C-alpha cells in the first residue's frame, strides 16, 4: 500500500499518521499538513480501495484489516512507532491499531469518533445508502457536504463545493468498495475493549456535528482510561476543514502534551 511521507524536520522526529474517514482520501488532511510537518514526520495515505491504492475489497472487509494493512505498510517503510490522528472511521482504525499493535502506537487523536455507531449516525448512513442505490455516485457525492459542513460555511463557498463534487465524482471509490467500507464501520464495536487501550488519547469533537452526536465523544472519554476531550463550538463533522485554526491549535497542543511529555517520561 502506498504511503505519503514528509521529510522529518529533525533527526528522530516523532511520526504522526493521519487516517481519514469513509472517503478514504489522504488529501482530507491538507489543512493540517503545513503545521504538522514543522514538528513531525507526517504520514498520510489513500486507504485501500480508494485513490492511488485501488483494489477490490472483500465482502467481509473489516476495521481490523484496515489497521493491519496500514501497520504493515508503515513497518515496510521503516516506521515502528507512531502517533495516530483519525477522523470518524479513521478514529476506529486508530483504536484498532492501539489494541493490536500497542508497542507501536504512542498516542491517539480521535476526531468526531465513537465506540460503536450511534442510532442517529446509522440513520444518516441509511439515507445516504438509499441515495446511492437510487441516484448513484452523483447523488452520494452531492449529499455528502450536507453531513460534513455547517450550512453557513457551505453557503459562502458554493463554487468550492461544486469543484469538490466534480473531483469526488472523478475519483469515486466505487459502489461496492464504498458499501464494504461502510459495513465495516457499522460493524465496529469497541464498547467492550476500549478499556484495554493504555495509550493517551485526545478526543476532539464539534458541537454542531450533524452526523456524529457529541455524546459519542463523551462515551469515548468515559470508556478510555487515559483520555481528554475538547469540544469545538463550530465546524461540523469536518471541523478540521471548516475551522482549521481552532482545530490545529487543539491538535498541536494535544500532541505536545500527550506525546512529547509521555515519551520524555519513558
From Swiss-Prot:
Q: Name one Pfam family in it.
A: Abhydrolase_1
Q: Which reaction does it catalyse?
A: carbamate + 2 H(+) = NH4(+) + CO2
Membrane among the record's keywords?
no
BP GO terms, sorted: nitrogen utilization; uracil catabolic process
Tell me a Gene Ontology molecular-function term this record carries: hydrolase activity, acting on carbon-nitrogen (but not peptide) bonds, in linear amides
Which keywords annotate this record?
A: Hydrolase
- What is the E.C. number? 3.5.1.-
Q: Name one GO cellular component term.
A: membrane
Q: Indicate the segments forming the AB hydrolase-1 domain, all copies.
A: 14-115
Q: What does this protein do?
A: Involved in pyrimidine catabolism. May facilitate the hydrolysis of carbamate, a reaction that can also occur spontaneously.
User: What family classification does the UniProt entry report for this protein?
Assistant: Belongs to the AB hydrolase superfamily. Hydrolase RutD family.
- Stated name of the protein: Putative carbamate hydrolase RutD
* Gene name of this polypeptide: rutD
Amino acid at each position: 500500500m502506498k504511503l505519503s511521507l514528509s521529510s522529518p524536520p529533525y533527526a528522530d522526529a516523532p511520526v504522526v499518521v493521519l487516517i481519514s474517514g469513509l472517503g478514504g482520501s489522504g488529501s482530507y488532511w491538507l489543512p493540517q499538513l503545513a503545521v504538522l510537518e514543522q514538528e513531525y514526520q507526517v504520514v498520510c495515505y489513500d486507504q485501500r480501495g480508494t485513490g492511488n491504492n485501488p483494489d477490490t475489497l472483500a465482502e467481509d472487509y473489516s476495521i481490523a484489516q484496515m489497521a493491519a494493512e496500514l501497520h504493515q505498510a508503515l513497518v515496510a517503510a521503516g516506521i515502528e512507532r507512531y502517533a495516530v490522528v483519525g477522523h470518524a472511521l479513521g478514529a476506529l482504525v486508530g483504536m484498532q491499531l492501539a489494541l493490536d499493535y500497542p508497542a507501536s502506537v504512542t498516542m491517539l487523536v480521535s476526531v468526531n469518533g465513537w465506540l460503536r455507531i450511534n442510532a442517529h449516525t446509522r440513520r444518516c448512513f441509511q439515507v445516504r445508502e438509499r441515495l446511492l442505490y437510487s441516484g448513484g455516485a452523483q447523488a452520494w457525492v452531492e449529499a455528502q457536504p450536507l453531513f460534513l459542513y455547517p450550512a453557513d460555511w457551505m453557503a459562502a463557498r458554493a463554487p468550492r463545493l461544486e469543484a469538490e463534487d466534480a473531483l469526488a465524482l472523478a475519483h469515486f471509490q466505487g459502489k461496492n468498495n464504498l458499501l464494504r467500507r461502510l459495513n465495516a464501520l457499522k460493524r465496529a464495536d469497541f464498547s467492550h475493549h476500549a478499556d484495554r487501550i493504555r495509550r493517551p488519547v485526545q478526543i476532539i469533537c464539534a458541537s454542531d456535528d450533524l452526523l456524529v452526536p457529541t455524546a459519542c465523544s463523551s462515551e469515548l472519554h468515559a470508556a478510555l482510561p487515559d483520555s481528554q476531550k475538547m469540544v469545538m463550538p463550530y465546524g461540523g463533522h469536518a471541523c478540521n476543514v471548516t475551522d482549521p485554526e481552532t482545530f490545529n491549535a487543539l491538535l498541536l497542543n494535544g500532541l505536545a502534551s500527550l506525546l512529547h511529555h509521555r515519551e520524555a517520561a519513558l
